[in-house]
Amino acid sequence: MADIKASIDRKANRRGAARLAAVQALYQMEIGGAGINDVFAEFDSHWLGNEVEGDRYLPAEAAFFRDVVAGVVRDQVRIDPLIDDALSKSWPLKRVAAILRAVLRAGSYELEHRKDVPARVVVSEYVDVAHAFVEKDEAGMVNAVLDQIARRFRTGEFARG
């Protein structure tokens, strides 16, 4: 039983690291104009599970990282209006900080397409990712927006309680 729990914990940590890396990659693409292939190559060789500037990064589930980044890039034209609808009308997505846009896009993609992960886990994980970059109030906004999007795509999960 302990072996199963340890295996699940390792997978969860690798997925959490993949989410953090995906948000960083999406941010880098938006701010720096890097292409997806360049970002994949850089993260594969320098970030995922390596030491960078004295910080050791957790090994990430590379396939999960690639799925989230590629999915956001492919679906961003459709994802952004979903996020805009969940935001306050006086604060559209274009006014949200770039790092938070990356968090919201990655979380929205995962909520719609990664049904293998419970919605509450997705929301919680991306709130944790947001905490790595922003203050508590902004992370609360991530929670509220992703919760709305989760209820749209995963109504069955919320109907069960």
From Swiss-Prot:
Originating species: Nitrobacter winogradskyi (strain ATCC 25391 / DSM 10237 / CIP 104748 / NCIMB 11846 / Nb-255)
InterPro entries registered for this protein in UniProt: NusB-like_sf, NusB_fam, NusB_RsmB_TIM44
Family: Belongs to the NusB family.
Pfam families hit by this protein: NusB (PF01029)
SUPFAM superfamilies per record: NusB-like (SSF48013)
Gene3D superfamilies: NusB-like
GO BP terms, alphabetized: DNA-templated transcription termination; transcription antitermination
MF GO annotations: RNA binding
Name of protein: Transcription antitermination protein NusB
GO cellular component terms, semicolon-separated: cytosol
Chain's gene name: nusB
Record carries keyword Glycoprotein: no
